[in-house]
Amino acid sequence: MTTRTSGYVREEFVAPPEHTFTLPDSTIVRSIEQDGTVEVFLAQSSAPIAIFSPHARTLRVSPHGIVNDDRAVSSPAPCFTTAEPALSTEDAWAALYALWMRRTEKDVLPLVLDSRTESLKPYLVQTGLAFSPPDAQSEFELLVVRAAFWQGAGAPVNRHWLQNMVPDPSTSIAPFPAITSFTRTEHVLTTHPLRPPKPAPGAVIYSRYIHTVNQQLTLTHIDANNLEHFAAYSRWQNSERVNIGWRERGPDEKHRKYLADRLADLHSMGVIIAWDGQLAGYGEVCWVKEDPMGTYVGGLGDYDQGIHILIGEEKFRGRHRFTAVMTSLYHACFLREPRTEVVVSEPRADLPIVPRLIAYLPQELNREFELPHKRAVYTVVRRERFFQAAMLY
């Protein structure tokens, strides 16, 4: 579908005939497409775990009840089958991941389950990965939804992009409860929900394979006691380029205090950005209701979030990596709290990166506004728009 809005155009990813990527649990997924058939393999297996093959059936993919019949579009519904005696839900999710990476331009995909995969229907429907459309002629004709997949529907805990979740899914399946809390600082005076505790420093909080650069991107809760983390953070903040935007240059004592304050502050968490384990930059995610930005902007919800980012290493700069890092930070925010409706940021208005934010990301530049230390641009990414148009590849 067309994703052009306010200067942003999503670049489509076209997978090669044989395509390989890695899941967060290090499982290797390989898919091969030939003559319209997609076969999906795991690890070094010589036999496919899943096969999506052409089928005579077509299903309407235009929204039912919205689009007039004379405008409605239908698409062929491939048959989803397997050579396995029983395909696990974990592997079914991996197979759908591989399929979506070959159909990045689609919002929904029709599928027909056969006798080998019909047992997966409860998993697909009850998790929201798929639904049975009105024009289905059998209960095993489904539409799978891309936005649902990227929101983590049906994702196995060990393969989920969000790592070290709080609350831990093994101890609680409910979201963190809504308990009124209060923050009073120099710039903030507000009630807000009590925030969940942060994962331990050094814990990976997000991991995703970035297909455009063929590397694994991770976000790790920064650990100031980790010599590699601290040395990199200090070097980046003391560089001329980063200091223009962040203005945190100083001795080690200043950096240690900054990171200690971040660790003690429940509303904000610092993360190390890495590519295949190589440290690349630093970012922060925060609950914006009790952030100074929330005070000066106003109108933000109890669960809305904000991000900050710096790319410290020159070799990890560039459009595709920058877009992937920003997209991943937004993705992590929306995944960690399903009640988050918007994620915002406030870069300095005079930074050269600002015009590129509209071109690279599905966000709006709302306005310029004043903060005590800078004139900033207020950017907004909305949940629905993100999962419709973000470049999650």
Curated annotation (Swiss-Prot):
Keywords: Acyltransferase, Transferase. GO terms for biological process: ferrichrome biosynthetic process. GO terms for molecular function: N-acyltransferase activity. InterPro entries: Acyl_CoA_acyltransferase, Acyltransferase_MbtK/IucB-like. Its EC number is 2.3.1.-. Pathway: Siderophore biosynthesis; ferrichrome biosynthesis. It is an enzyme of class 2 (transferase). Pfam families: Acetyltransf_8. Signal peptide: none annotated. Belongs to the lysine N-acyltransferase mbtK family. L-ornithine N(5)-monooxygenase; part of the siderophore biosynthetic pathway. Omphalotus olearius produces ferrichrome A, but no other siderophore has been detected. Ferrichrome A consists of a hexapeptide ring made up of one glycine, two serine, and three N(5)-hydroxyornithine amino acid residues, the latter acylated by trans-(alpha-methyl)-glutaconic acid residues. The biosynthesis of ferrichrome A depends on the hydroxylation of ornithine to N(5)-hydroxyornithine, catalyzed by the monooxygenase omo1. This is Acyltransferase ato1. The lineage of its organism: Eukaryota, Fungi, Dikarya, Basidiomycota, Agaricomycotina.
